[in-house]
């Protein structure tokens, strides 16, 4: 099920800009790639990559791409329902719930994704690759696989009390 970005009030954040060079006979041709995260700070977040000769154009393309890849994040108040490990390439991110008032404890690219998803109290630990693209991808992977107790109970045809014990 695709999420319609036009119905959401999306904010964007540029996580990483990379300059790449193609060496040709006449010298070097430079291009830029931009890794962009968009989110409504209310349970929807997406990530996109844009490439172009100019930085603003790369960012614009990244935002467009991110809007096409929005995911819904299961939340319990201001945190995640349970701990989960997301994986993308060799990047692994462990996302853990935190008590109210803790804030977002996460490094660099992971923090941008968690904040734009609308999580206020969450802890995250980056394991494996610290490449921004892999870290952001792993975070999105983890967040998209989160399920609340109500969702699991509905899937299994049981009550929430039976699931939680």
From Swiss-Prot:
Entry's Gene Ontology cellular component terms: small ribosomal subunit
Listed name of the protein: Small ribosomal subunit protein uS5
Cited NCBIfam families: rpsE_bact
Designated gene of the protein: rpsE
One Pfam family, short name: Ribosomal_S5
Signal sequence, start to end: none
HAMAP family on file: Ribosomal_uS5_B
Cross-referenced PANTHER family: MITOCHONDRIAL RIBOSOMAL PROTEIN S5 (PTHR48277:SF1)
Species this protein is from: Clostridium novyi (strain NT)
Entry GO MF terms: rRNA binding; structural constituent of ribosome
S5 DRBM domain ranges (all copies): 10-73
Function: With S4 and S12 plays an important role in translational accuracy. Located at the back of the 30S subunit body where it stabilizes the conformation of the head with respect to the body.
Family recorded in the similarity comment: Belongs to the universal ribosomal protein uS5 family.
Assembly and binders: Part of the 30S ribosomal subunit. Contacts proteins S4 and S8.
Biological processes, Gene Ontology terms: translation
InterPro entries tied to this protein: Ribosomal_Su5_D2-typ_SF, Ribosomal_uS5, Ribosomal_uS5_bac-type, Ribosomal_uS5_C, Ribosomal_uS5_N, Ribosomal_uS5_N_CS, Ribsml_uS5_D2-typ_fold_subgr
UniProt keywords, alphabetically: Ribonucleoprotein, Ribosomal protein, RNA-binding, rRNA-binding
Domain statement: The N-terminal domain interacts with the head of the 30S subunit; the C-terminal domain interacts with the body and contacts protein S4. The interaction surface between S4 and S5 is involved in control of translational fidelity.
């Amino acid at each position: 099920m695709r999420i319609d970005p036009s119905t959401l009030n999306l904010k964007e954040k540029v996580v990483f800009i990379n300059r790449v060079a193609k060496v040709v006979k006449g010298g070097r041709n430079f291009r830029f790639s931009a890794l962009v995260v968009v989110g409504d700070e209310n349970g929807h977040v997406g990530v996109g990559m844009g490439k172009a000769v100019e930085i603003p154009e790369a960012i614009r393309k990244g935002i467009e791409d991110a809007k096409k890849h929005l995911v819904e994040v299961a939340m319990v108040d201001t945190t995640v329902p349970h701990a989960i490990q997301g994986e993308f390439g060799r990047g692994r991110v462990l996302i853990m719930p935190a008590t109210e008032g803790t804030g977002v404890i996460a490094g660099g690219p992971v923090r941008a994704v968690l904040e734009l998803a609308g999580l206020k109290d969450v802890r995250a630990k980056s394991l494996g690759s610290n490449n921004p693209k892999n870290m952001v991808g792993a975070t999105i992977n983890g967040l998209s696989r989160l399920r609340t107790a109500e969702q699991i109970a509905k899937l299994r045809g049981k009550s929430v009390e039976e699931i939680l014990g």
